[in-house]
Design a protein with these regions (language model features):
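Conserved active-site tyrosine of GNAT-family acetyltransferases
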Residues: 123-124, 128, 151
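Conserved catalytic-core motifs of GNAT/GCN5-like acyltransferases
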Residues: 110-112, 129-149
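Short amphipathic helical patch at the helix-1/turn junction of helix-turn-helix
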Residues: 80, 113-114
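Short glycine/proline-centered loop/turn elements that form peptide/ligand docking sites
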Residues: 90, 94, 116-119, 136-142
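Acetyl-CoA-dependent GNAT
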Residues: 2-6, 10-85, 94-100, 104, ...
């Protein structure tokens, strides 16, 4: 089996097309989690927002978007293209987010995730603990409601 190196690089608003394509591939539309292109551009224009892209063989494989304010940061989005899953890309992105938070003097890192999202295993594996629940937070295409859980990790 061939080994493919994961390259992480800082992104910017010019990468919104890549982010949009990765969200389309990674987020199941029935849960209503993907952001629009304009939402991404708006958030990327905000102070304290950092986008990290993961590339495998020069192909976009995933991304993480984080917003920092004072000594707290929130993981806004993390996505890995299904064609690249189970290769450590999500772990590499999350570890990069944690390392950047440590270097920036962040005390706490927060995130919110659909309760039945398989990524919960990644977050708990990386030291996040559930601290809250938002009932019916996500609305699917058919109007179904899905709970969200909030997680926190000291940095």
């Amino acid at each position: 089996m061939a080994t493919h190196q994961i390259l992480l690089r800082t992104g910017d608003p010019r990468d919104v097309g890549t982010v949009d394509a990765l969200m389309t591939a990674a987020f199941d539309p029935r849960y209503g989690e993907a952001w629009t292109r304009n939402q991404c551009l708006g958030v990327l224009a905000m102070p304290g927002v950092r986008l990290t892209l993961a590339l495998v063989d020069d192909r976009p494989a995933g991304f993480a978007m984080v917003r920092s304010v004072m000594d707290e940061a929130e993981l806004l989005l993390l996505a890995v293209d299904p064609a690249f899953r189970r290769r450590g890309i999500g772990t590499a992105l999350l570890r990069a987010v944690i390392a950047e938070a440590q270097m920036s003097g962040i005390a706490d890192l927060h995130l919110e995730v659909r309760a039945n999202n398989p990524a919960v295993a990644l977050y708990t594996e990386q030291g996040f603990a559930k601290v809250g629940e938002r009932r019916g937070y996500y609305r699917g295409r058919g109007g179904e409601a899905f709970d969200a859980h909030t997680y926190r990790r000291a940095v």
